[in-house]
């Protein structure tokens, strides 16, 4: 036998059996089925993305054990056929243009180099774009002008109305009522005790008037009793009907007023004193209010200063406490280092103190 014939037969046996190739096309979107069927006993198979290899599916996307799918690379890859009837066609759902390419259906049979291989070429094209013409209907508006002339006749009856003169009498009653009654109710409460914190010195000029009657009669003088400057009520002089009187009055102060009637009766009025007391009370109230306001402001300022001082003390304490802790930690670490150095020095000194004493009486 020729050697060439032997070599060719060996190559055919080593190569897997190829059933053929199929071409499948479709548009992107719908599902596409790649056909694959085999005969004989139910056996395992695989689908490979790419051309069929020599021994196994190197880029397998679906594997079966003959009756069930054991591996699926993507959920879009499905075997919808009856595996027990040897229908192992591959269905790809939601296809895209990127799915185009070569697929290999490999069915494994018993024995060496007996696998069946089917090569499927898939071509997916983009979906066709359908252009729908748009028809626009424009309604036509027709305008019809109609002119209608209607004769208009208007009859207005003329009626003469007699003139009537109506006498008009206008009477305007005038009533003027003037009420000139004025009632003034004045209630004056003079406090019996008045505390005036300030001392006011008022110069007093004393004028002594003496009336000499034409006839010598016994004369009686009523002089006011001297009072202290703190007394709010001045000394009063009772009215006298005597023909001679000596009166001491302050001429520079408007607090006193005197009236004299025809019978030489002297009457003293205390309105000026009451007005002075009211003015002094108002001044005292104003001073008290101002002092209270100043006290409130001073209290608020003092409170703020106290709070700021407390805050500064707390911050200073925290700062010094941290500083002391750091100093203690540094001193503690330095003490440990010194202790270790002392221990090392003692050990070295102890080793230096060891010496060897040779015996003077050495034996042969």
Swiss-Prot record:
<feature type="cross-link" description="Glycyl lysine isopeptide (Lys-Gly) (interchain with G-Cter in ubiquitin)">
    <location>
        <position position="338"/>
    </location>
</feature>
<comment type="function">
    <text>Phosphatidylserine receptor that plays an important functional role in regulatory B-cells homeostasis including generation, expansion and suppressor functions. As P-selectin/SELPLG ligand, plays a specialized role in activated but not naive T-cell trafficking during inflammatory responses. Controls thereby T-cell accumulation in the inflamed central nervous system (CNS) and the induction of autoimmune disease. Also regulates expression of various anti-inflammatory cytokines and co-inhibitory ligands including IL10. Acts as a regulator of T-cell proliferation.</text>
</comment>
<dbReference type="Pfam" id="PF07686">
    <property type="entry name" value="V-set"/>
</dbReference>
<feature type="disulfide bond">
    <location>
        <begin position="52"/>
        <end position="104"/>
    </location>
</feature>
<feature type="domain" description="Ig-like V-type">
    <location>
        <begin position="21"/>
        <end position="121"/>
    </location>
</feature>
<comment type="subunit">
    <text>(Microbial infection) Interacts with hepatitis A virus capsid proteins.</text>
</comment>
<keyword id="KW-1003">Cell membrane</keyword>
<keyword id="KW-1017">Isopeptide bond</keyword>
<dbReference type="GO" id="GO:0006911">
    <property type="term" value="P:phagocytosis, engulfment"/>
</dbReference>
<keyword id="KW-0732">Signal</keyword>
<keyword id="KW-0812">Transmembrane</keyword>
<feature type="repeat" description="9">
    <location>
        <begin position="184"/>
        <end position="189"/>
    </location>
</feature>
<feature type="disulfide bond">
    <location>
        <begin position="36"/>
        <end position="105"/>
    </location>
</feature>
<dbReference type="InterPro" id="IPR003006">
    <property type="entry name" value="Ig/MHC_CS"/>
</dbReference>
<keyword id="KW-0325">Glycoprotein</keyword>
<dbReference type="InterPro" id="IPR013106">
    <property type="entry name" value="Ig_V-set"/>
</dbReference>
<feature type="repeat" description="1">
    <location>
        <begin position="138"/>
        <end position="143"/>
    </location>
</feature>
<comment type="subunit">
    <text>Interacts with STAM. Interacts with SELPLG.</text>
</comment>
<keyword id="KW-1133">Transmembrane helix</keyword>
<feature type="region of interest" description="12 X 6 AA approximate tandem repeats of V-P-T-T-T-T]">
    <location>
        <begin position="138"/>
        <end position="207"/>
    </location>
</feature>
<dbReference type="InterPro" id="IPR052331">
    <property type="entry name" value="TIM_domain-containing_protein"/>
</dbReference>
<feature type="repeat" description="8">
    <location>
        <begin position="178"/>
        <end position="183"/>
    </location>
</feature>
<comment type="function">
    <text>(Microbial infection) Acts as a receptor for Hepatitis A virus.</text>
</comment>
<feature type="repeat" description="6">
    <location>
        <begin position="166"/>
        <end position="171"/>
    </location>
</feature>
<keyword id="KW-0472">Membrane</keyword>
<keyword id="KW-0945">Host-virus interaction</keyword>
<feature type="repeat" description="12">
    <location>
        <begin position="202"/>
        <end position="207"/>
    </location>
</feature>
<dbReference type="GO" id="GO:0001786">
    <property type="term" value="F:phosphatidylserine binding"/>
</dbReference>
<feature type="topological domain" description="Cytoplasmic">
    <location>
        <begin position="317"/>
        <end position="364"/>
    </location>
</feature>
<feature type="repeat" description="4">
    <location>
        <begin position="156"/>
        <end position="160"/>
    </location>
</feature>
<feature type="region of interest" description="Disordered">
    <location>
        <begin position="216"/>
        <end position="257"/>
    </location>
</feature>
<dbReference type="InterPro" id="IPR007110">
    <property type="entry name" value="Ig-like_dom"/>
</dbReference>
<feature type="repeat" description="7">
    <location>
        <begin position="172"/>
        <end position="177"/>
    </location>
</feature>
<feature type="repeat" description="3">
    <location>
        <begin position="150"/>
        <end position="155"/>
    </location>
</feature>
<dbReference type="GO" id="GO:0001618">
    <property type="term" value="F:virus receptor activity"/>
</dbReference>
<dbReference type="GO" id="GO:0033005">
    <property type="term" value="P:positive regulation of mast cell activation"/>
</dbReference>
<feature type="glycosylation site" description="N-linked (GlcNAc...) asparagine">
    <location>
        <position position="291"/>
    </location>
</feature>
<keyword id="KW-1015">Disulfide bond</keyword>
<feature type="repeat" description="5">
    <location>
        <begin position="161"/>
        <end position="165"/>
    </location>
</feature>
<feature type="compositionally biased region" description="Polar residues">
    <location>
        <begin position="227"/>
        <end position="243"/>
    </location>
</feature>
<feature type="disulfide bond">
    <location>
        <begin position="46"/>
        <end position="57"/>
    </location>
</feature>
<dbReference type="GO" id="GO:0031514">
    <property type="term" value="C:motile cilium"/>
</dbReference>
């Amino acid at each position: 036998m020729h050697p060439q014939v032997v070599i060719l037969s060996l190559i055919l046996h080593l190569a897997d059996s190829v059933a053929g190739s199929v071409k499948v096309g479709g548009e992107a979107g719908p599902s596409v089925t790649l056909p694959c069927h085999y005969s004989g006993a139910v056996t395992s198979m695989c689908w490979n993305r790419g051309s069929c290899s020599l021994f196994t599916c190197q880029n397998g996307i679906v594997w079966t054990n003959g009756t069930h799918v054991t591996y699926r690379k993507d959920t879009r890859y499905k075997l919808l056929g009856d595996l027990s009837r040897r229908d192992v066609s591959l269905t790809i759902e939601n296809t895209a243009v990127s799915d185009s390419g070569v697929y290999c259906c490999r069915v494994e049979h018993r024995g060496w180099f007996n696998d069946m291989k089917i090569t499927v070429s898939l071509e997916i094209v983009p979906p066709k774009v359908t252009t729908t013409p748009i028809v626009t209907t424009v309604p036509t508006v027709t305008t019809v002008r109609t002119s209608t002339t209607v004769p208009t006749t208007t009859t207005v009856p003329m009626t003469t109305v007699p003139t009537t003169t109506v006498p008009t009498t206008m009477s305007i009653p005038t009533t003027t009522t003037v009420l000139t009654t004025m009632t003034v109710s004045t209630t004056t409460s003079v406090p019996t005790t008045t505390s005036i914190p300030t001392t006011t010195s008022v110069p007093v000029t004393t004028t002594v008037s003496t009336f000499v009657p034409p006839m010598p009669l016994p004369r009686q003088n009523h002089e006011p009793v001297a009072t202290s400057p703190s007394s709010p009520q001045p000394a009063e002089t009772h009215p006298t009907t005597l023909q001679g009187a000596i009166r001491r009055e302050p001429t520079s102060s408007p607090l006193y007023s005197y009236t004299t009637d025809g019978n030489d009766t002297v009457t003293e009025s205390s309105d000026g004193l009451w007005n002075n007391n009211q003015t002094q009370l108002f001044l005292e109230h104003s001073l008290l209010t101002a002092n209270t306001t100043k006290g409130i402001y001073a209290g608020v300022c003092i409170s703020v200063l106290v709070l700021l001082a407390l805050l500064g003390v707390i911050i200073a304490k925290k700062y010094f406490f941290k500083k002391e802790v750091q100093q203690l930690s540094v001193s503690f670490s330095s003490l440990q280092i010194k202790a270790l150095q002392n221990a090392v020095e003692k050990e070295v000194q102890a080793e230096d103190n060891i010496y060897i004493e040779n015996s003077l009486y050495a034996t042969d």
